[in-house]
């Protein structure tokens, strides 16, 4: 199995406008689940903001452990390791969809939020 992602990690990191999110980037072509890898590296002490990225997930999971179809090179599959105070964690389900929709709108697309955390563009769910 090839584990070299198409993502150019150096270019990706050069374009980041953050001090921590995505600065530690673990990019793979195919892994079972970005969430599982993120959990493992977090337990091993990965820093806040570590980004686990994959071109494909062979055992991806969505909410409540539901199977998540993750074909190669069709979508963005990633998980962040976040080391934040509990009070911030509780607000993330509200904050993140707002931030994602805003970022998409800044690129000229009409992103809509379907609560609690789905983002839709032109009647299609995009995340």
Q: Residue ranges of each PLM-predicted region?
A:
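N-terminal lobe of the biotin/lipoate ligase/transferase fold
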Residues: 1-109, 126-127
């Amino acid at each position: 199995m090839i584990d070299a992602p198409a993502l150019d990690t150096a270019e990706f990191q050069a374009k980041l406008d953050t001090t921590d999110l995505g600065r530690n980037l673990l990019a793979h072509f195919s892994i079972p689940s970005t969430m599982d890898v993120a959990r493992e590296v977090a337990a091993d002490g990965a820093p806040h903001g570590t980004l686990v990225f994959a071109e494909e997930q062979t055992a991806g999971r969505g909410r409540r452990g539901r199977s998540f179809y993750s074909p190669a090179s069709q979508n963005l599959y990633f998980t962040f390791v976040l080391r934040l105070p509990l009070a911030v964690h509780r607000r993330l389900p509200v904050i993140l969809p707002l931030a994602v929709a805003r970022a998409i709108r800044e690129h000229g697309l009409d992103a809509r939020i379907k609560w609690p955390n789905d983002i839709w563009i032109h009647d299609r769910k995009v995340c």
